[in-house]
Amino acid sequence: MGLSTASVYPENTQAAFRYAAELGYDGIELMVWAEPASQNIDTVQSYAKRYGVRVLAVHAPCLLISQRVWGADPVAKLERSVRAAEALGADTVVVHPPFRWQRRYARGFAEQVGELEAHHPVKVAVENMFPMRADTLFREGAVRRLERRAGPGRAVSAFSPSYDPTDTGFDHYTLDLSHTATAGTDALELARRMGEGLVHLHLADGRGAAHDEHLVPGDGTQPCAQLCEYLVDTGFRGHAVAEINTQNARTTAARSALLARTLEFARRHLTGATPDPQPRHADLP
């Protein structure tokens, strides 16, 4: 079970390694974004060595807030992400479908993904996203509206050709359970469509709000436990990674508790085990 460095924001990348070591996570998914340390492979390698936590995956800098990280060319950024994963010993790169305005990138995206996988020992796992919903402007009642409509209602996709990567078809996928909530997508059905190509799970939850929530699994309406059990039953051998929002945690202890709950959920439903309840503070420098 891995921990996304995004899960500790507004704390930094080093803090994510520290939490992972303390709580007993197996590894890290590195979110490459504006923080300089996240962009520096030598720095990340030093964290991995110091805390004894390996890097499982690299999340390419493809968010709206990271459009200028590692340059402005998304083609070059994806290639650099794959090379970074290789250098860090990670076997997976997580990437979003191209934005609609990235026309050249979008036209060649599927071909580039295939070529990168053919020439590097890294899986490029394309992540399911969600549409921009009209009720984003009216957050009150958004969850009830989604339930009533059995879908997101009036919405527009910012992604080309779709926010659902199975509409295009790739060899490898990332399934995000917060994104399925916002999109009104059946997570189990999406997992079945992804099939053996599902190699990476962002374990989170959501209630169907118009915005992306990334709740602790079990705190929303997504079939998190059922999906984990489905993965066990189908022989899933990829990475499950906690990608939750802890911005509202007022203290490190509160943030640690949220991360520990997520790890306990994963251990229970993916392995039938529970983590050591005593963080390993004494082992850290």
Outline where the language-model segments fall.
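N-terminal small/glycine-rich loop or linker at the start of catalytic domains
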Residues: M1-L3, L56-I65
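Short, well-structured secondary-structure segments
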Residues: D26-W33, R54-H59, V93-V94
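Glycine-rich, proline-tolerant flexible connector loops at the mouths of alpha/beta enzymes
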Residues: E29-R50
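The substrate-binding groove and active-site-proximal loops of carbohydrate-active enzymes
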Residues: M31, L63-L64, R68-G71, F99, ...
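Glycine-rich anion/phosphate-binding loops
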Residues: Q39-N40, R68-R80, R103-G108
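Short, structured patches in soluble enzyme cores that scaffold and shape functional sites
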Residues: P97, V126-F130
